[in-house]
Amino acid sequence: MNKFFKNILIISLTFVLLLSILIIGILWNYSNNIPDYKFLKNYKPPVSSKVYSGDGELVADFSQEKRIFVPFNSIPKNVINAFLSAEDKNFFSHPGVDAKGVLRAFINNITNIITAKRLEGASTITQQVAKNFLLTNEISLNRKIKEAILAFRIERALSKERILELYLNQIYLGSGAYGVAAASLEYFDKSIRDLNYSEAALLAALPKAPSRYNPYRDIELAKFRRNL
C-alpha cells in the first residue's frame, strides 16, 4: 500500500472513530435526560365519569375526554390488525424503531419535498406511545432522538401486547374520543366487539389527522383515507 492510500485510510478511520465517539456522546447525554417510562407497566388511563339512571340510561357524562379502558385480550383481532396495517406493519418484528420504515420515509420525502407534498412520518406504534405519554408534540430533532431512545427502552421493559394496549386505549381519534372503545361508541354507537373490518379500518385511518379525516366532517374523505 503506497503512502497516499495509507494516509487516506488513516484519515478515514480517524473520522469514523471521532464520529462514533460524537454519536455515543450525544446518545449518552440524551439517555440521561429522558422521562421515566417505568410507570407505563401498570398505568391505566383515566376513564369517563358517567352517571346512569336506575334503568341503565346514561344521564350525564362529566368528562371532557371520552375514554373507555379495554384490556388487550378484549380488543378484537380485526381492530388490532386494522391499526397495525395503517400505523405499523412491522410492529411485532422491530425493536421500537423501524429502520426500513425510516429509510423508506427518507427516500419518499425527497420526492415529496420536490413536489411540495405532505411529508411522511416513520414513527412506530412504540414511538407514538413514547410521544403521547412522555413527550410533547414539538417537531424537532431533539424530540425525535428522545422518542427513539424511549422506544428502544420501552420495548425492553414491556411486552408487545402491553404496548399495543397502551396505544389503543390512549390514541386520540377525534370528536373528544380517546382510545378505540370510546371512538367505536362515538362514531358507530356500538361496542368494539361488534365492529366489522370496514369500521375498524375507518378508526385506524384517524390517528394521522383526526380532525381532517373525522367522518362527521367529511365522510368521503374519511373513507378515502380508510381505503389507502
Model regions: which residues?
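N-terminal type II signal-anchor transmembrane helix
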Residues: 1-52, 90-91
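Non-catalytic, structured segments within soluble enzyme domains
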Residues: 23, 116-228
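Short, glycine-/polar-rich solvent-exposed loops and beta-turns at beta-strand/coil boundaries
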Residues: 42-43, 62-63, 95-100, 141-144
